[in-house]
Amino acid sequence: NLVRVNLTNFSKNDKKVVLLTQTYPSPTSKEIISEFLDQYPNISHVTYDAISDSSTLDAFENIYGLRAMADYDFSKAENIISIDADFLSDWQGGGYSSGYTMTRVPDKSKKKTMSYHIQFESNLTLTGSNADDRVPARPSDLKKIVARLYSKITGNGEVKGSLNPTIDKYVDSCIDKILKSPNKSVVVSGIDDSDVQELILLINKSLNSEVIDINNPRLIKEGDNKKLNEFISDLESGKLYGVITSGVNPLYSLPNTDQIKEAFKNLEFSLVFSEKEDETAKSAMYIAATNNYLESWGDYELKKGNFFLAQPTIRPLFDTVQFQDFLLKVLNSDLSFYDRIKSNWQNRILRGKTWGKSLQDGYYNDFSSLNLRAQKTR
């Protein structure tokens, strides 16, 4: 009731409040948050990923209209050209090593050829140490390499500035290999620049690469650095009257935390959902003790068309509340988060499959929901 009264007063007076959360790749959570924002139009939602992939997300959204990240199946690759992408580590969520190793084992029968992997990078990485050719390059040269590949493969644009002769030789060699088997080749990059990431997507589109999957992309992150920077600016300038956080600890993970901490303490209202009294919780007016994930219901769509259910393994041990259940109470709903998950799945996700069967299996696949086409070319 206290939270509802505060939020209602802020809404009546059009005082700006921000809901700052982690990425929730949960269709039901997104639905509840959307209803919450509809009831309180003065509240804006900002998604914050402590380890950001905002540039990659921006690029994919600009070209394909969905805030997501392309997925890759390296088991289909004959040529892998990586520009500062440590994809054998935690690049874009990780999980690529198994597909990569499938084409890296010599075949004694010689019926299958090993994939060729070249790594252009400014610092030694796990992926670079496993490459057939590792080419050290300055960060400024890495962008030129991407531009050169784009220009040669798509036939668009001109590249200004020259490359080191050794690097130039490797780039030309890459282009020759790619053009011999374009649909079995892939170009990836870890450069934190949305323009570079757009070029990477357009290169792979031009190659008609079978390695990249844009129709069922990864939805594990949604953070937007532009919105985050706007939030920080509004917080420090006193334009915000309230902040609600869930699943994030910005006073630990953001830079310049002393200045942000001081601004956070000057808010008229601050509510932190947290399992422990972390740095952000200590500076908040109110702390809402949340369930551990082992005590919680949840649904997830980590990859487009792949839906998963999470069931609690134990009852809540303490007097805690799940973030989604709290929002439902603020919305005066009699339903629990579990009830909403069940209703949402039955009405919007399941196609002829029963809820009980999905609950037993723990997942449901629907690959008919999306067929993305490029909305932008260069």
Regions found by a protein language model. Name each.
Residues 12-47, 51-55, 77, 90-95:
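A conserved hydrophobic secondary-structure block that centers on an alpha-helix together
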